[in-house]
């Protein structure tokens, strides 16, 4: 197996920016929700529920129900436009149906909040906030962990224990993080 890193390291500024990005991805949606619910929402009744309904709908529709259909996308991996179109349609259908049902649920369970201008904001903050936390911070966490492995000199050992089917994807990430051409 060829050596991937060749004494390359991930710069300290890149590692610092990863940590800042992770902090933003975690703190921004939660901080905004707390601020809106405590300071802005009138009446406060139902505001927290709306935020968590948004989170729940994202988790259910994008995280669980959409999952089985992602396997079909592998058929389109070698055709970028079809892969992008399928992914966009899949996300669009599941997330929009989820939003529709989420607002129907709010309309039925918290009817006095349905016309409140903060309702769609709080719902979107829950929906997008969970996406930001799960997708944004977890991606950065993965890159951060790879950076730590690279900088400690342990990445070659990890790659040697990695199944061949995953090795090329990890090698591409390593090369991207170290600034080497992929």
Q: Predicted regions span which residues?
A:
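Hydrophobic alpha-helical segments at protein termini of multi-pass membrane proteins
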Residues: 2-182
